[in-house]
Amino acid sequence: MSKTLQSRKSLSGKLRRAANTRIVVEGNLALSIANDLLSALDVEPFNSEEDCISRSPKFGISPDQFRNSYLRAEIMSKYDSFSLGINTEAVAWEKFLAAEAECAKTNLRLYRPNYNEDFNFSLGETCIHMARRKIVKLLGDSVPFEAVLRHCRFSGGATTTNSRLYGHPSFKFALAQECTPRAVPYVQALKACTNMDLGITKVSPFNKAVTVPKNSKTDRCIAIEPGWNMFFQLGIGGVIREKLHLWNIDLNDQTINQVRAYSGSCSNELATVDLSSASDTISLALVELLLPPAWFKVLTDLRSRRGMLPDGRIITYEKISSMGNGFTFELESLIFAALARSLCELLNLQPSSVTVYGDDIILPSDACSSLIEVFSYVGFRTNEKKTFFDGPFRESCGKHYFMGVDVTPFYIRHRIVSPSDLILVLNQMYRWATIDGVWDPRVYPVYTKYRRLLPDILRRNVVPDGYGDGALVGSVLTSPFAENRGWVRRVPMIIDKKKDRVRDERGSYLYELWSLQQLECDSEFPFNGSLVVGTNDGVCTYRHRERVSTAISDSVGAYDIVWIPCSSRVLAPYGDFRRHEGSILK
């Protein structure tokens, strides 16, 4: 073994041991970091845990003052470990059932419109009629099932059959999934056209409504769908996503809304609109009024009509779908865009000036008040705290601007118990404090104070920004651990340690086949692939592919070290971590 490799293995061992230590301090470390940072910025620190989640920023001040005030309002707002004495699950269910009650009222109002004596349409009714014509023109009268099938897939989450631990698509192909009664014909048609041995465990008339953590004030309600329903829902969502490109709406790109939020903060000509409980307030009646009959039938065939609550109660949904449904995001984007574009046309504004990303909506400021009126009529509630149409502040898709200045805050979401947790917070602080390329001198002492809590070897290991948060961000030229080999520079990073878990061989091959048809069959469907799994070694007969791995890696709650190639230049803040080929040194 070469000296270089021996040295690297020795260093990896030291870094690994340091990464798996615990950070032990008195009190709440996350709150201490936030308060020290606010004090350094000459902003009032938090007086209590309740104070962390109940403040609003101050307007009418300079961009720098607003940026600091806004950081105070946001930094701990998503922290999930405060002990506030709030039953977060009960709060979530109360909100969920309230949204259902609102949808019931909306259904009654839209199915039985109350026209006046002169039979004049309200603004909301007029927008519904215009939006329907726009949607029919965009989607077409019939559903393109071949296109839908190309987008169908299993997600990586839980289903009513598979827990999250077995959420990988290969497990879902291996284990027959449930579906609702009206979705059975779709599964049968899929089985007939693909030659794949697909099965249904049972026909389930409902999904499972559950809660997941959100913050210290409330949980979030989602629905776990039957597996086959989710499979086809994602197909419908994929087609709608493609169709929206005709309106210059790209649901794969958040930067469109982010750039327009910047523009709105400079010119005041664009408004950013956000909705409360958007996915839980899309009523059945609204979808039936807006979508062509064929599309509405498919959506209702593939949705879960009823849901089971944790206490065993069965409810009949008044909404079309909820978070957890595979087409909710695309459907809500379509509806919001259609209504906003129709309103702009009525007001003689450019419909093309509307962009949406889920419930993040941007349109001309002159149309914002009218849009709020239209949304109220069709059952949507505008989030007043996150809707801006007049003034210097705009926020959309995670970017926040004040008079054209980037004031995007960072968030401390969880307890800090490991070096990896602290590195994440310190890197967020670094990016926030160096947004203009140099350190804010007020913040640097706070950064160095808490950096000392890290083991010495982790304090010295730095990587350029853009490669994730597996090490402190900084200039790689100052790292004593970077290896230079010709044109390649390698640096060590902390990653979650994973352990291989064997998955079903047949499910692995079925998943591989399905993935291949999605990549290679742009226009030809059905895909009549074949699969042969022998009793001894199992070989996929599709083309000349290598044998498929039948193992899947799961985190084991510890950390490991990987060496990755990187550039010596510092990338822009918030860069994406692109995983390079690197070997994990055992």
Curated annotation (Swiss-Prot):
Enzyme type, top EC level: transferase
Molecular functions per Gene Ontology: metal ion binding; nucleotide binding; RNA binding; RNA-directed RNA polymerase activity
InterPro entries, per the entry: DNA/RNA_pol_sf, RNA-dir_Rpol_cat_phage, RNArep_beta
Cofactor: binding details: Binds 2 Mg(2+) per subunit, Ca(2+) is used in crystallization to prevent RNA polymerase activity.
Residues that, per the record, bind Mg(2+) 2: 274, 359-360
Protein origin, superkingdom: Viruses
GO biological process: viral RNA genome replication
Entry keyword set: Magnesium, Metal-binding, Nucleotide-binding, Nucleotidyltransferase, RNA-binding, RNA-directed RNA polymerase, Transferase, Viral RNA replication
Reactions that this protein is recorded to catalyse: RNA(n) + a ribonucleoside 5'-triphosphate = RNA(n+1) + diphosphate
EC number(s) reported in the record: 2.7.7.48
Oligomer and partners: Homodimer; the replicase complex can dimerize. Part of the viral RNA-dependent RNA polymerase complex, the other subunits are the host ribosomal protein S1, EF-Tu and EF-Ts. S1 is needed for the initiation of genomic RNA (+)-strand replication.
Protein name: RNA-directed RNA polymerase subunit beta
Taxonomic source organism: Qbeta virus (strain MX1)
